[in-house]
């Protein structure tokens, strides 16, 4: 009988290299927020992939960046601490971007850990196949990797192969989560992330890092209907106007798009009621950040 394998795998990389896209591709559900704007993942999100012979729990870390406020400090602390708690690390980079300072900073961190580190060259659909090997070699000049794997998370290219590679490095262990469970975050947190994703997609550059979403109330009204009330927090009055839009059109579109994803997640019809409030300088208020679910209670 084949031994069952299980392990925890961290996904790390500069902002927007496709970490969340990869995890959502593997899980088949939207768990990690996806956006083309930097610093969109604010919390460790555990995505659970269960197969007959293995279970891999993915940890999607905040994008590496230089902190500018207390929330940023916390995001960096989460990313660094995660590396010491896992069985393997995926260092993901973009095939169509040269090595930057952020990549070099991450590799300096990774040199000191003892767990297997996989270099994943993502977005290979954007470059010529002849470019892939030189890209891998350029990273290998900086540090040794357990294996280097080119892929396109968005297109699904080489993803299954990489999962098989990962499984071969996982230790023997039990199934930590039951079949069908794809995240260890409460549903309210995932719902708030889906709403925040739509705000990021539909608002201008002024808004993204100032956005926080809190699910105030989530009630199952019947077997196939859920009522959700949520508040979108911004830091300035001008931002509130941008999120709401002329005649409330922008907020209505945010709600419409979020509702579709939430219904797919919950498998129920959803009534979604959204509010927009100003909470000045909220990213520097530790208690408020904790209330929003971005800081875990620590001993």
UniProtKB/Swiss-Prot annotation:
It is a peripheral membrane protein. The keyword tRNA-binding does not apply. One of its GO terms (biological process) is ribosomal small subunit assembly. Keywords: Cell membrane, Cytoplasm, GTP-binding, Membrane, Nucleotide-binding, Ribosome biogenesis, RNA-binding, rRNA-binding. Residues 122-125 are annotated as: G4. InterPro entries: G_ERA_dom, GTP-bd, GTPase_Era-like, KH_dom-like_a/b, KH_dom_type_2, KH_sf_prok-type, P-loop_NTPase, Small_GTP-bd. GTP binds at residues 13-20, 60-64, 122-125. Residues 151-153 are annotated as: G5. Its main location: cytoplasm. Residues 39-43 are annotated as: G2. It is found in: Cytoplasm; Cell membrane. Residues 60-63 are annotated as: G3. One of its GO terms (cellular component) is plasma membrane. The keyword ATP-binding does not apply. Residues 203-280 form the KH type-2 domain. PANTHER family: GTPASE ERA, GTPASE ERA, MITOCHONDRIAL. Monomer. An essential GTPase that binds both GDP and GTP, with rapid nucleotide exchange. Plays a role in 16S rRNA processing and 30S ribosomal subunit biogenesis and possibly also in cell cycle regulation and energy metabolism. Belongs to the TRAFAC class TrmE-Era-EngA-EngB-Septin-like GTPase superfamily. Era GTPase family. This is GTPase Era. It comes from Staphylococcus carnosus (strain TM300). The lineage of its organism: Bacteria, Bacillati, Bacillota, Bacilli, Bacillales.
């Amino acid at each position: 009988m084949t031994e069952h394998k299980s392990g925890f795998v961290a996904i790390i990389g500069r902002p927007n290299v496709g970490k969340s896209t990869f995890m959502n591709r593997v899980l088949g559900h939207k768990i990690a927020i996806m956006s083309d704007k930097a610093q969109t993942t604010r919390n460790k999100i555990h995505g659970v992939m269960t197969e007959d012979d293995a279970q891999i729990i993915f940890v999607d870390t905040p994008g590496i960046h230089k902190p500018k406020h207390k929330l940023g400090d916390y995001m960096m602390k989460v990313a660094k601490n995660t590396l010491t708690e896992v069985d393997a690390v995926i260092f993901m980079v973009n095939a169509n971007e040269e090595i930057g300072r952020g990549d070099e900073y991450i590799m300096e961190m990774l040199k000191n850990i003892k767990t297997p580190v996989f270099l994943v060259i993502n977005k290979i659909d954007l470059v010529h196949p002849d470019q892939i090997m030189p890209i891998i070699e350029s990273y290998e000049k900086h540090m040794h990797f357990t294996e280097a794997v080119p892929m396109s998370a968005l297109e699904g290219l080489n993803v299954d192969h990489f999962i098989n590679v990962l499984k071969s490095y996982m230790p023997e262990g039990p199934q930590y989560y039951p079949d069908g469970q794809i995240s260890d975050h409460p549903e309210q947190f995932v719902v708030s992330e889906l709403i925040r994703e739509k705000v990021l997609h539909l608002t201008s550059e002024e808004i993204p890092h100032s956005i926080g979403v809190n699910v105030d109330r989530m009630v199952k009204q019947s077997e196939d209907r859920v009522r959700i009330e949520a508040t979108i927090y911004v830091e300035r009055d001008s931002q509130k106007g941008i999120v709401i839009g002329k005649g409330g059109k922008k907020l209505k579109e945010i709600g419409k798009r979020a509702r579709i994803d939430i219904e797919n997640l919950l498998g129920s019809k959803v009534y979604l009621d959204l509010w927009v409030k100003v909470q000045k300088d909220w990213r520097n208020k530790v208690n408020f950040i904790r209330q929003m679910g971005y800081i875990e209670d620590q001993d």
